[in-house]
Amino acid sequence: MSASTTATTRHDWSLAEVKALFQQPFNDLLFQAQTVHRAHFDPNRVQVSTLLSIKTGACPEDCKYCPQSGHYNTGLEKQKLMEVQKVLEEAARAKAIGSTRFCMGAAWKHPSAKDMPYVLEMVKGVKAMGLETCMTLGKLDQDQTLALAQAGLDYYNHNLDTSPEFYGSIITTRTYGERLQTLAYVRDAGMKICSGGILGMGESLDDRAGLLIQLANLPEHPESVPINMLVKVAGTPLAEEEDVDPFDFIRMLAVARILMPKSHVRLSAGREQMNEQMQALAFMAGANSIFYGEKLLTTANPQADKDMQLFARLGIKPEAREEHADEVHQAAIEQALVEQRSSEMFYNAASA
């Protein structure tokens, strides 16, 4: 299969086709992925996001990989929903270190009616700073999805995690169909989709291919596809899983790039365990988005200055964003904070 043919956007990939991509010689696969990547993106630009946990721990879901699950004793400090003011301050700091997108994650099965007003104010406030907004809050119903869209949310993250066949071995508290339904609600509301999965949970090659097929065969490809490497946390059922072979992880990125040529493929959780050479291969394979800053929800993430040093050595620059004068952003931040101070939710979000 030539690189030129795979640059065409498709939604009808078969398991045999995708496994054949995985099984190519490594150099051939990287060449094909890089060729597809260059057809749609500047190969030396990477989109930079910051992720903030706005509510941590005590999640009722039983995802075997997750330290935030209330089913496992991982020693994670539980935190209630963050105050809106604090979220806006963190967003301003993310913008100052170069992020163009601010992602907010809450450890919920689904957001409750009492929490939604605070969440919507967070979206509006971050949006006013000139940042793209992204949230991951669990399963959504149609009304919640429409409310988030009306508040200005740009992206909603809802990962499929793995193939439909392996999914039941990892999670029992939410069905695969529910995840797909949430993605459909998000798309119907006009928001962009961020959806990917995790490597290193004991899945097979068929499962890795199956995950990518689910994503690539959606009616529209996700705009962002995060590929995570399992971060093994003591106390979770997957704490003793074998490490992912670095070349297998790079293959996953490359095949994701080929199947979804216009999507941003994000090098996500697990990057702290990757050396610079592995990260460079990831960018060569077509990864063009990273999380940037100190923490990725509850796991360490390479420090921002290390990222910029690596970018400089590789000749990579952060993806351009629409810029406004600093005083305009400052005015937006100040206005958002003033509005929050005049609202009861500004004070009560953490205890609601």
UniProtKB/Swiss-Prot annotation:
Cofactor note: Binds 1 [4Fe-4S] cluster. The cluster is coordinated with 3 cysteines and an exchangeable S-adenosyl-L-methionine.
UniProt keyword list: 2Fe-2S, 4Fe-4S, Biotin biosynthesis, Iron, Iron-sulfur, Metal-binding, S-adenosyl-L-methionine, Transferase
Homology family: Belongs to the radical SAM superfamily. Biotin synthase family.
Biological process per Gene Ontology, one example term: biotin biosynthetic process
PANTHER family: BIOTIN SYNTHASE (PTHR22976), BIOTIN SYNTHASE, MITOCHONDRIAL (PTHR22976:SF2)
Protein name, as recorded: Biotin synthase
The enzyme's E.C. designation: 2.8.1.6
Keyword Nucleotidyltransferase: no
Biological role stated in the UniProt entry: Catalyzes the conversion of dethiobiotin (DTB) to biotin by the insertion of a sulfur atom into dethiobiotin via a radical-based mechanism.
Subunit: Homodimer.
Recorded catalytic activity of this chain's protein: (4R,5S)-dethiobiotin + (sulfur carrier)-SH + 2 reduced [2Fe-2S]-[ferredoxin] + 2 S-adenosyl-L-methionine = (sulfur carrier)-H + biotin + 2 5'-deoxyadenosine + 2 L-methionine + 2 oxidized [2Fe-2S]-[ferredoxin]
